[in-house]
Amino acid sequence: MLNKNSASSQSLPRVHSFFNMIPSIMQDDLALTILNDRDNMFSIKSQRSHGEDLIVTPFAQILASLRSVRNNLLSLTNVPASNKSRRPNQSSSASRSGNPPGAPLSQGEEAYTRLATDTIEELDWCLDQLETIQTHRSVSDMASLKFKRMLNKELSHFSESSRSGNQISEYICSTFLDKQQEFDLPSLRVEDNPELVAANAAAGQQSAGQYARSRSPRGPPMSQISGVKRPLSHTNSFTGERLPTFGVETPRENELGTLLGELDTWGIQIFSIGEFSVNRPLTCVAYTIFQSRELLTSLMIPPKTFLNFMSTLEDHYVKDNPFHNSLHAADVTQSTNVLLNTPALEGVFTPLEVGGALFAACIHDVDHPGLTNQFLVNSSSELALMYNDESVLENHHLAVAFKLLQNQGCDIFCNMQKKQRQTLRKMVIDIVLSTDMSKHMSLLADLKTMVETKKVAGSGVLLLDNYTDRIQVLENLVHCADLSNPTKPLPLYKRWVALLMEEFFLQGDKERESGMDISPMCDRHNATIEKSQVGFIDYIVHPLWETWADLVHPDAQDILDTLEENRDYYQSMIPPSPPPSGVDENPQEDRIRFQVTLEESDQENLAELEEGDESGGESTTTGTTGTTAASALSGAGGGGGGGGGMAPRTGGCQNQPQHGGM
């Protein structure tokens, strides 16, 4: 899809994507069907892409309909087609009559009347959609709202299946939706009930709000950036003429060199690199990549300065974190490097853009505390106050990284012109902020809209001739790298899952000790790891990688194949549900209400997009455990682990136990 026309081939597998959870229709059936179902997908055949393609984003659907209307008018009016501004017609735009695009019809024929009626209905649908578009919202917002509705519907069904399904649904909702949600609470929270507060006080317990006010340690003044160590280490570490071959001093240089020779390979043995580099994986991986790409030369970065900065940066990753440490940063950086090498992207990005993407991957989790954004917000942390609860960790990572550049001997961009430096800084900020997992749906919607619009337009080529389009691809590229663990060889994937779950459990332990509500997937006594991985792949990872694979087709097919094999493994490892135990004296005791309620602004926009849908524009779905799951995917849930850096962020829906805690 980028700067080249790919040959026709088989469609990419869409086995587990939530895009497939609704029926698909051929574009030439649109006029009769789409008026009754706003969630339907278009299926078009493109000679310029790869077989049959599903169109799900609203803007691309409108564009496809208008192209169909145009072709129908050519058939109805016998007006010669003008080639001044239109690309050649695609076979996907054939009319319902079965005639090729532009084939003349005679008045009075049944096919003529049917085609005229279909054309009017299709044009009316397009007008309805265009009339409801708000001028202050982008076309990508239309897709994002639609995807949220699809995801909410599926999570509601899944939450009905079991307590674990409810917990997993809550995790996905709270992690991957970027809007703060309003909650319909079935009962008072502990800290809102005076009697419960008094009882807990007598027992020596505290609510989350009380704990935050009385126990939160005072951080540094907000005029300073917390987490920056003083004095900074490694300022003058490399004073000699000879620099280490791979950027780090290690007695196992030969073994390390062998592994680093595979940096362009997907699924490198990153854990061995961490061992052979004496726990300096980020420094050696970044140094080797920048050397091999000749970025030190093209960006005029002194090698000694680069190593000073990278060593200082790596020191500011928290080594005690099981997951969010410098090894994870090295893994994301190496994955970003491989994705930048994909043939479809050859020659697309400048050295400044490539260097910016790799730099963003290096710094994207620096000084991560091993806690989620939502934990920092709930505990009224200094960081949450500083960044107004918005992308708290991501803003902090950026602030720390750019502050480290100001340290003497660490400014790797010192030789850049002011304009270049400003451009790179803007790129890095945009990319790192996009690693906030609550932005996932917006990123996916943007990418899907871009890909499908080009498919419908018939070009099959993305020019990427402006900053918005170029940074959008780079943001999604690094986002894919950050969510790449489920696409790696199974032994690596399983190891990452174990590390991430341990970090989640450590947060859950803190929450339990502090009297706070335990976050979804953070209770080590109530974990559903295998099931969560299946759902995480089905609802989050596969849709993202599927769309990326469409963009760079066919370069990511092997990655998709591995992803599906890993999904099947975890599906096979889900333990059977325990048999029902005796008679439940109080069947309501264990029932948990799951509810997804969108913001008022999102409700209004969804209502506009869904007018005429059988749901009547409602944006709230409710279910309870103990009923049969209506999900189209067997065993699908969500969230869990193994998706590099995926941690619950701001916003989302909550499970509210009707009787006590989770």
From Swiss-Prot:
Entry function: Hydrolyzes the second messenger cAMP, which is a key regulator of many important physiological processes. Vital for female fertility. Required for learning/memory.
Binding site for a divalent metal cation 1: H328, H364, D365, D482
EC number assigned by the record: 3.1.4.53
Gene: dnc
Superkingdom of the source species: Eukaryota
UniProt cross-references to Pfam families, sorted A to Z: PDE4_UCR, PDEase_I
Protein's organism: Drosophila melanogaster
Residues annotated as signal peptide: none
Record domain PDEase: where: 248-577
Phylogenetic classification of the source organism: Eukaryota, Metazoa, Ecdysozoa, Arthropoda, Hexapoda
Annotated protein name in UniProt: 3',5'-cyclic-AMP phosphodiesterase, isoform F
Compositional bias segments (type: Acidic residues): 599-616
Cofactor binding annotation: Binds 2 divalent metal cations per subunit. Site 1 may preferentially bind zinc ions, while site 2 has a preference for magnesium and/or manganese ions.
